[in-house]
Design a protein with these regions (language model features):
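Intrinsically disordered, metal-sensing/regulatory segments
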Residues: 1-152
């Protein structure tokens, strides 16, 4: 398989993981109720673990190569602050667009990081694509449940 087709396939799989999570959320009636709650907590924890793994295994080591520790810390905190402000604004607005904006604010940086990893020819692109896919399954799961809950 050519490198271009490999990149297309890996990015497609990472992106399609979100609808897979939504399909899993479609079958949500698990008895007993406590088991359903534990499953939701487990899926959310799995997504958080995948996200932290992507940061620790791929993004931070790549960033350290190009930035000093101080600059990396400032950029990390600035990004965290920007997303906190966005989250506060979205929770205040409480519109139907809030979920879309939240998903896009996650999708765009993921796409940029994945594209940059593959453009640099780094083998970490494959790992990053796998970690993004693992994180997107719980994201799709939770987004489906939130959208369904807000429509009733």
């Amino acid at each position: 398989m050519t490198p271009l087709y490999s990149v297309i396939l890996l990015t497609l799989l990472a992106g399609l993981a979100m609808p897979v999570g939504a399909m899993i959320a479609h079958y949500e009636r698990i008895k007993p109720i406590w088991l359903e709650a534990e499953l939701m907590h487990g899926i959310t924890a799995f997504g958080g673990g995948a996200l932290l793994s992507a940061i620790a295994l791929v993004l931070v080591p790549e960033g350290i190569e190009y930035f000093s520790a101080g600059a990396a810390a400032i950029l990390f905190l600035t990004g965290g602050f920007a997303f906190m402000v966005l989250d506060i604004q979205l929770s205040k607005s409480d519109t139907s667009m809030s979920q879309l904006v939240a998903m896009l604010s996650d999708f765009i940086p993921e796409s940029l990081a994945l594209g940059a990893a593959f453009a640099l020819g780094n083998i970490n692109g494959v790992l990053l694509a796998a970690l993004i896919a693992m994180q997107n399954v719980p994201e799709g799961f939770n987004a489906f449940r939130e959208l369904k809950a807000s429509s009733h």
